[in-house]
Amino acid sequence: PDVSSAASDVYKRQVRTTPCEREVEGSAGDVMGGEIPTDSSGALKYLRVQYAGYEVFPGNELNGITFGGVGSGTSVEYIQVHNNADDCVEFFGGTVDVKHLICTGADDDNLDIDWGYQGRLQYVIVQQANDKGDHIVESDNVNSDSAVGYLSEPRSNPIVANFTFVSSCLLYTSDAADDTSG
């Protein structure tokens, strides 16, 4: 496929999210979701995304890679997102497993987990830039402004292993009650 004009990959497939079908961030009305946790979107291997992402409109940005309801039958391995203008990778629901992910220099969060994502993440390296970046990981269920609320199911519950995080500084601390939405 021709990827020369792609600013961001938006994967959307048939895996249950909250509610079952939703519009995915960064799209023009495309919906994602479904009820097949083992659904396959194919394979995404040996990919480097760099200098991508932008704000489509306030509160709706393109990530380096957006996974919208992607199932565990999808193979995602050996991926790097470098200097993205929003999140490195964001998961909106789904059960996709990701191995060997490198995130460097994201302007916002490096890993953003929402809407009941229940996949596995293994062998992940995150390096924040010194002058930008928000959270290394932002993980919540459903944002507080959503009509479906905090306690929606499925709940975000990823399994993570073999992570290395390199932060830009140690001066920032957060009160979880002030900085979370799920």
Name each model-derived stretch.
Residues D9-K12, G33-P37, V56-F57, N63-G69, ...:
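Glycine-rich beta-solenoid repeat tracts in large extracellular/virion proteins
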Residues P1-A7, Y11-Q14, Y172-G182:
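Single conserved hydrophobic/aromatic residue that forms the stacking wall/gate
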Residues S5-S8, D112-Q127, T180:
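Internal hydrophobic scaffold segments of catalytic domains
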